[in-house]
């Protein structure tokens, strides 16, 4: 397998925000893409917007967000769940990074904002990775995550509940796997999920 460069890496992003409703955020994206937003009456009261490539961007509810709305020139707290917005991108390529950046700008211009309850999640496509590259990635993350967490000012509540650090026992077990033991990802998954494969669980 050829080495995967940054420009070959696909990704997806979840951006949590408030200040505007999901409908307003969807309209901001639709205006940018030249399309029409679509509401889906699902559990998350989602709105969908197709971009110029036909990919769907989702605006969904997230109960962990502390809602705010603009009243006059100021933002004030609100219990209205429509102001709890999570913007979920489709699978994107490196070349689409400027499009993602412009979407963030459009939502911000429409009145979107963040507060301490908001976060951002970046999902990296593992399709071009193998067992060894994932083991290497685990080691790199372990060695750099304290610097990253400090630079991003991740608060202790989020560390405990949503973005736990790599645990050293997990790292040591992964490093000890031989090439024979990692012909498939099953054993590496077992180590990552610390027993049962919880890959279908939300925070894994």
Place the predicted regions along the sequence by residue.
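C-terminal accessory/tail domains of diverse enzymes
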Residues: 1-114, 127-204
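Short, conserved phosphate-binding/catalytic loop or strand-edge motifs used
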Residues: 116-120, 124
